[in-house]
């Protein structure tokens, strides 16, 4: 195992040396020496040397204002380079990739060992559906311009990995690496202005262009090979096991910057980008498909006998169609009113048909090897991305729909919809949904908020079918929340039935989710509308913020289990949409573990999950990483459907109820009921300063003033990650476990840990958080930043963390954290040496900036922002 890490460590050390050379060249020997001294002290302090720890604190406290920024940047940039080396390690032939046999090949072997029939496996492959929803959560701290440089660093590491390089080749690559490290150093790593929703959407398109466009067909090629080798089965050309959707430009929940006009613009931009990428593909096909032999059907399609190169002829027509469509979209984006061309591309079939005709003809004429080249990749892209490139979800909060309809009923003299009972609301909505006349009068001039809701529905109605994937209702609580959206879409003249997904995200809403859906499915009109398909979104982040991570995850499990059983009984195919984040407090977990820990049957309707902020870059930042991420997802979904996890035993459910109640009580006891908690949170973390980071287009708070409940889940997690207490990801969990142990359930817990993936994943996630948390750093933040009257609260929380770690180790029967995942333990240890100085420096900078009466020194502010970005890179997640 150590040989594996030695390759990564030598890359890390090489990149560190290059960064050191750059710093020395830019700022002189004395700054580099200062950075080196701090690094050595940090290493020694991590090894347990108390004197080094004290010296580290003194050194960082005594930095002059002009040393603050270079030191912060040095450690922050080093962590970015470490992450890049680690990402490369995961795909390097000498790293993880070498020791990780193909996830899919392993799975097929295991399935055969379990005596599953090949027919069952093929059916599961045919039904495989994975939809990844890219969201612009403000967690991707790294600027796009730096990401491009880091991607190129990755390419250089890959080039250096060849043993047969000539000296001049190696020198050339090293020279390029030096340039990239220097370019990064001389680039400002902190954005100066917040990205707009359109900027965020462009960031999403860049992920498609730079990674997914290559990565998806490459994964499907590999998947097809595994299927041929294991099952003697080919993936049908028209199969769409992978799809991408985006919330960028569609998610208006709590983000007033996402307007109907923005959504309209992003839809056009997305279609424009699709024409741009497909034109490149078609250009290659025009030059490749020079063959003349074809089937009579294709000859006729191409224009008869006189056409000498029929495939080329068809490709040129597609090229013209793409060019005309692109010109039209460009004019629309500039705000010009133009007539669409007669051959405007609006549906995937328009692209698919001529390409597939060429594919079939080539195969029929014995040219399968050509058909299965670039042409097959393009066909797969048409299926995965198509004319819209990425579909978008529209998300809005339930009260906005209620307010809009209430304003309308008041205007029409029907009374105040908002004050009606749920039964009256449903009766009114169903009556209107069945009515042939419009409800919204032509001359009505609603308020700006209502106008915005109606206009958004019009944008959906005008969009080509297939470019909007779903309408998600956040904070959904009752059946009328879902019916209201269907009515608003009907009033906008929407010509197709759009999936409307309620999002249940607080503890109470999760507990009521099954009841709400049962009522909806009992409405005949509704059953007729949905045609046997229903999507429900499960919120992870807000439920964890509301009740603590243990109670929330049990409520999520129970809600999913109940919904699966209700829909099965009603003959409805249920797609559960998981709104999980990158961090543990927002439901994040390694994909494979997370999927296998869900209730049996939860993936029958396919997987739909959000991929957030910085996790998009870690999982899909490079084509090679995309291939391995998709392979993990595919193998996890197939495994969950073919070898479902066990139904929990009655006793396990009872233990989880004890755990959940006790953990929720403790969590809320601190977070909601302790009057000192909010002042402590504001003082001990950079929560207030985080608002200054121009991260996403979305405000950090739902309401400008107010306590924890008004904070969005992301800044809440982000703040606690910065001071290394990691509180949202564990508070209450250990106390709940201890209560179960005190009730004599220790043996049961050990069995649950061994035999129940749901529970073992929870314990594994707690271990990961504990490995990243740090007691002495959290205490240092208190000493430097918190009023003495609040110190006892901080001490209580740290004592609780220590007790929780012991409980988890006792249940997992380990003597140290992450014993079964040494690779992650190694990765955390490698980073800590560089993250610790950033944490100490951050506490110092917060202290300085809060001491200053007037506006803080620009140097201090800038350095503070760099430490926030650096700690986020060190923790490998933000919020």
From Swiss-Prot:
GO BP annotations of the record are: carbon fixation; oxaloacetate metabolic process; tricarboxylic acid cycle
Name the PROSITE patterns for this protein.
Answer: PEPCASE_1 (PS00781), PEPCASE_2 (PS00393)
Asked whether the UniProt record includes Lyase among its keywords, one would answer yes
| Swiss-Prot/TrEMBL catalytic activity | oxaloacetate + phosphate = phosphoenolpyruvate + hydrogencarbonate
Highest taxon of source: Bacteria
A GO MF label: magnesium ion binding
User: What Enzyme Commission number(s) appear in the record?
Assistant: 4.1.1.31
| Active site per UniProt | 137, 545
UniProt xrefs under Gene3D superfamilies: Phosphoenolpyruvate/pyruvate domain
Q: Which GO terms describe its cellular component?
A: cytosol
What the entry lists under SUPFAM superfamilies is as follows:
Phosphoenolpyruvate/pyruvate domain
Stored InterPro entries: PEP_COase, PEP_COase_bac/pln-type, PEP_COase_Lys_AS, PEPCASE_His_AS, Pyrv/PenolPyrv_kinase-like_dom
Q: Which top-level enzyme class is recorded in the Swiss-Prot or TrEMBL entry? A: lyase
Query: Function of this protein?
Result: Forms oxaloacetate, a four-carbon dicarboxylic acid source for the tricarboxylic acid cycle.
> Which family is this protein grouped under?
Belongs to the PEPCase type 1 family.
Name of the protein described by the UniProt record:
Phosphoenolpyruvate carboxylase
Organism, scientific name? Yersinia enterocolitica serotype O:8 / biotype 1B (strain NCTC 13174 / 8081)
